C-alpha cells in the first residue's frame, strides 16, 4: 500500500540525511507475516530476487517495453563517469564500515550505496533520471513491515515530464505488484516462522 511520506520520514533511517536534498517520489509498505526473530533487509532482498519470476506478466511486459525503449533512445547505456556522478561520495567512513556490501555493488539495474541490517539504499543513473530505491524493514507484533521509498533527482528539464508520464503505471501496476510478489515470496520462505514479539 502507498503510505504517507511522513510515516516513512519518521523512521530512523540513514537515507533521510544522505538524500536530504533529493525529492521523495513515492513510499510503499507491505506487512510480512511471520519470519521469526532476527530477519534483516538482506533476507528481504533475497526473497525479492527469488520472487522476480513470479511477477505478473503485465509487469514483466512493462519492464521489457521500458528496456526496449531505453535501448532505442540510448537512455540506459553505461555512463563512464558513474563514480563521479554517484552519491557514494556522501557516505561517511562509518557508513562504509557498517555496510554489508561494498558501495557500487551491482543489484539488478541499480548499484548498492549501502546495505545495513535494517536498511538498503540503491542508485540508478541513466539519461532520464537519477533514482534511488530505499528498502527497509522493521519488526512488528505479527512479523515485519517492509518499506520501499523512491527518490528521484532530475537530470534535465524532461525528467519531471518523464516521471509524470509513467506515474500511472508505477502506482497502479508496478509498485503494488512488487509489494504483492514480495509478500508471496516471503510467505513461501518464512511464513511458517513464529511471529516477532
Stretches found by the model and what they are:
Residues 25-29, 119, 145-147:
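Intrinsic-disorder/low-complexity, polar/charged segments enriched in Ser/Thr/Lys/Arg/Asp/Glu/Gln
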Amino acid at each position: 500500500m502507498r503510505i504517507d511520506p511522513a510515516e516513512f520520514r519518521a523512521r530512523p533511517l540513514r537515507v533521510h540525511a544522505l538524500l536530504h536534498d533529493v525529492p521523495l517520489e513515492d513510499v510503499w509498505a507491505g506487512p510480512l507475516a511471520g519470519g521469526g526473530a532476527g530477519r534483516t533487509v538482506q533476507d528481504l532482498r533475497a526473497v525479492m530476487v527469488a520472487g522476480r519470476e513470479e511477477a505478473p506478466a503485465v509487469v514483466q511486459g512493462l519492464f521489457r517495453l521500458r528496456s526496449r525503449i531505453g535501448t532505442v533512445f540510448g537512455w540506459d547505456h553505461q555512463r563512464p563517469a558513474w563514480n563521479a556522478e554517484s552519491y557514494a561520495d556522501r557516505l561517511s567512513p562509518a557508513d562504509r564500515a557498517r555496510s554489508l556490501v561494498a558501495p557500487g555493488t551491482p543489484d539488478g539495474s541499480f548499484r548498492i550505496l549501502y546495505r545495513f541490517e535494517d536498511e538498503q539504499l540503491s542508485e540508478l543513473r541513466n539519461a532520464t533520471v537519477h533514482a534511488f530505491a530505499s528498502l527497509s524493514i522493521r519488526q512488528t507484533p505479527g512479523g515485519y513491515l517492509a518499506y520501499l521509498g523512491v527518490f528521484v533527482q532530475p537530470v534535465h528539464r524532461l525528467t519531471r515530464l518523464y516521471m509524470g508520464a509513467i506515474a500511472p503505471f508505477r502506482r497502479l501496476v508496478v509498485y503494488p505488484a512488487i509489494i504483492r510478489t514480495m509478500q508471496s515470496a516471503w510467505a513461501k520462505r518464512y511464513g511458517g516462522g513464529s511471529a516477532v514479539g
